[in-house]
Amino acid sequence: MDTEYIRSHIRTIPDFPETGIQFKDITPLLLDTKANELTLSALQKPFDTFTIDKVVGLESRGFLFGPSLAAKFQAGFVPARKKGKLPYKTIQKEYGLEYGKDILEMHTDAINPGDKVIIHDDLLATGGTAKAATELVLELGGQVVGYSFIIELSFLSGKNQLLKEIPSHSIIQY
């Protein structure tokens, strides 16, 4: 089964980046051509019938599959980055983390009014970053039509932070 092949290429690193965290490392997916292709296909499939104008990739591991996913949809790729990393005019949204707050930014010209957008990241944990990205897309006049994740940590209930009426897909759940 494709999902199991993908799962077999995600390794858990205990106590990284701090004690008690079980870090899900997706870099083995990038080393194996078959795992890479299966992951990209699994990310695309739930949205095959959708019209997609942009894929927003969340810093930083959303940049690994995000551009390829955008290319599959013949859509543009939009990097959503932490404050101070984008060179042009930006809008920003503050969001909460388990250990504090951060700020997510997008270029002001990245989303056009009416653009249909998928928000993509490698992992859905608490949902704070995806929620901030959603708010930025909406502020620029875009329409979020889907959420795309490789991994979902279901026990953290991150989906509760996302727009309820919008489909959210993750390949692997822990």
Predicted regions and their residues:
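PRPP-associated nucleotide enzymes
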Residues: 1-174
